[in-house]
C-alpha cells in the first residue's frame, strides 16, 4: 500500500489501524540537537485525544506517545525518530454487524474494491485514529519552528454548521472543548451540538490554521509551491473536502484592485493572499482554511449495499464524533508544521547563501 510517507527532506511515514495493537510513525530528516521529550509531544496529543468532552467520541484512548529512537539525553541525534502509541480502548464487536456491509460515505466500499479485502473494525487504516501519530510528529516540527525560527502555528474552529465564528482571540481557543476563539459563541455551539446528538446526526465544520512570524522565501515553484503542498497536506486529513489559502473562494467576487496586497516601505497593506505569492511565502501570516464534511457514522438509518451487491440498510453503531471538525484543529496544526519544516530544510539546502538587495518589508500590521 503506497501513500504512507509525507514530505521530501523532513518525512513522516506512519503505520497502524484503528483497532490494531498500536499506531506508529518514523520521522526522517530532523536536524540533530533539538531538545525534545515525550512531554513536549503529549501537549497536542492531549488536545486531540478522544473521550475528553461530550462533543466527541466516547472512545477513551490515553494516546501516550513513546519515543523509541532518534533522541538521546533529551536531544535529537539526526537519525530516524520512532514514535509509538498503543491502542487500548478498541471495541471491535461494535462493527461485527457491518463487516459484510458498506457504510455509505465511508471508505469501506473503495478499500474493498481497491484491495479486495478490508479491516472493517473502526475503518482500519482509513480511520482518523492514524492522525494521532501525525499530531505527535507535528509536535517535533512545531518545537523546531518555534525555537529556531520563531514561527508559531495555531488553529481554531471558524465555523460549525450554521454558526460562523468571526472574532479570533487565540487566548480563548484552548480553554474550551470546541477550540473556539470567541467565548460569546460557546453557548450557541453547545446548544446546537446537544440538539444534534438527540437527532443521532452529525454536522460539518470549517477549521482555520495560521502560522505567524513567517520568513520570506519558503516554497519550491513550480510543482511544490508552498500553498500547493499545504493544500495537499490538509486534503490528506480525514473528512476534508475543501481547502482555501487566504481569501480562497471569496476571490471569485473580488476585483483585482481589491484583492491585490498593496505594498509600501512600511509594509503590506493587506493579506488577502494568505501569506503566499507565486507559491513562495511573503513573510506575512500564513492563513489556511479547510472544510470538513459531517461524518457518515450516524444512527440515522441509511441505504447501502453488502459485499454481494445486494441492497442493505445501515445503522452505524460504535463511538463516533458528531462533528469531526472539532478534533481536527490540532491535526491541521500538525500538518501545517510538517509542511513548513520540510520547506525550511529545502530552502536552507538550496538558498542558504542567497542575499537579496531588496529589504524585507513588514507584514500587515494587526
Curated annotation (Swiss-Prot):
The keyword tRNA processing does not apply. It holds the Pfam family Chorismate_synt. Pathway: Metabolic intermediate biosynthesis; chorismate biosynthesis; chorismate from D-erythrose 4-phosphate and phosphoenolpyruvate: step 7/7. Coiled coil: none annotated. InterPro entries: Chorismate_synth, Chorismate_synth_AroC_sf, Chorismate_synthase_CS. Its EC number is 4.2.3.5. GO terms for molecular function: chorismate synthase activity; FMN binding. FMN binds at residues 125-127, 238-239, 278, 293-297, 319. PROSITE patterns: CHORISMATE_SYNTHASE_1, CHORISMATE_SYNTHASE_3. Reduced FMN (FMNH(2)). Homotetramer. This is Chorismate synthase. It comes from Pseudoalteromonas atlantica (strain T6c / ATCC BAA-1087).
